Swiss-Prot record:
Keyword Cell division tagged: no
Role summary: Converts 2-succinylbenzoate (OSB) to 2-succinylbenzoyl-CoA (OSB-CoA).
Catalytic activity entry: 2-succinylbenzoate + ATP + CoA = 2-succinylbenzoyl-CoA + AMP + diphosphate
EC number: 6.2.1.26
GO terms, molecular function: ATP binding; o-succinylbenzoate-CoA ligase activity
Stretches of the chain forming a coiled coil according to its record: none
Gene3D superfamilies in alphabetical order: 3.30.300.30, N-terminal domain of ligase-like
Keywords noted in UniProt: ATP-binding, Ligase, Menaquinone biosynthesis, Nucleotide-binding
Gene that this polypeptide is encoded by: menE
Protein's name according to its UniProt entry: 2-succinylbenzoate--CoA ligase
Entry similarity comment: Belongs to the ATP-dependent AMP-binding enzyme family. MenE subfamily.
GO biological process, one term: menaquinone biosynthetic process
Species the sequence originates in: Bacillus cereus (strain ATCC 10987 / NRS 248)
One matching Pfam family: AMP-binding_C
Amino acid sequence: METMPNWLMQRAFLTPDRTAIEIEEEKVTFMQLHEKVVSVCEHLTHIGVKRGQKVAVLMKNGMEMITVIHALSYVGAVAVLLNTRLSREELLWQMDDAEVICLVTDQDFDAKDIPVYSFAEVMNGPKEEASIQEEFSLEEAMTIIYTSGTTGKPKGVILTYGNHWASAVGSSLNLGLRDDDCWLACMPMFHVGGLSLLMKNIMYGMRILLVPKYDADFIHKALQTRGVTIISVVSKMLTDLLERLGAETYPSSLRCMLLGGGPAPKPLLETCVEKGIPVYQTYGMTETSSQICTLSADYMLTKVGSAGKPLFQCQLRIEKDGVVVPAFTEGEIVVKGPNVTGGYFNREDATRETIQNGWLHTGDIGYLDEEGFLYVLDRRSDLIISGGENIYPAQIEEVLLSHPAVAEAGVVGMTDDKWGQVPVAFVVKSGEVTEEEIIHFCEAKLAKYKVPKKACFLEELPRNASKKLLRRELRQLVEEM
């Protein structure tokens, strides 16, 4: 069993006085962060959190969430990170599925069957001596993060200490490390992209400027004045920043804008080239512990639309019907590497289907060019990506079909200037219902960003001979709107 020293403890020992986290005007060193985490450990131990248990975390970006995530690793518990944008029903389902023993949150949340502890309540309560892991076993689970399959049923992706370590090492070999590096973190830490920055923070000994809530004005100013060298963004954020930049440019110390969440439009990249902003396009998912492919800024315009090549310790190929296909042939993107999950929690069926001989079948469609650069054509074909958030049509359709006046439902994405895409519903009625009623019904059951922006009524939905819904025909209807 391969082990490593407890990451934050080791970092606090090696560089105790180096700044770890900056939030607004607060600065915390690695030693101070370690001390805060030990305190949280002692409070969590008092409420009964033990090694091997799963604890749900529903918190916004901030020092509190950082200390809870690290404290759970200190006691050897598994952090089940919940998306704060989900509805109560969705959150309860995930907590039940993950078999959590309790929820730690900074929000008002009522759950009948699961003990709920507010962070303030935990920290104001008694302490108890904690049994702290001085070593991490790389095979052990560290986090569970839920992702939805095209079926719409979320699956808990198990990421081990080894997965997170490999992800951080792969990123450092790709982007390099500098003593003056500062990564601006504006992605939610319940997403693997945000969480991966916490890992890099303690492994690299790198300063992180944490933005509690997405604020384009603050981020724009921080890039100009706070010594930021790297930032992770999605296209929507990049567009917001360019609007604020106007005719100016960012300091040359900004060496990398890591762009994820789907391919970027060419005009956006051309503007970045004009302004000397180095954009690195990436491809990754929860199952790969963040990025697995990156296109360096050198190729921004010669390989427009490409997600680049795999990280050093990763492999990637394109398969069709189980056979590896040559360059420029479309097929399924299949990946392998030490950062790739070993499977889904309590879902042996999905694990067997997705991971074969160590290769993860992503369900995404793409091709490689003659030099091995990846081009992603469709992210899980039916997926809607709205403001960097994944929306699975099947989940919305399930909600629509639970309405008594809805006989059939189909959902596709519609292009939106602000969010990239937004969901649109097509409905066959079985009784009297209005568009407004349908949207209101969805608002009660879905996260706000998943609620259809339009509901259109049809006599029947387009289907093939085997009665499978033809989403491409619904997309054509959207284009004609």
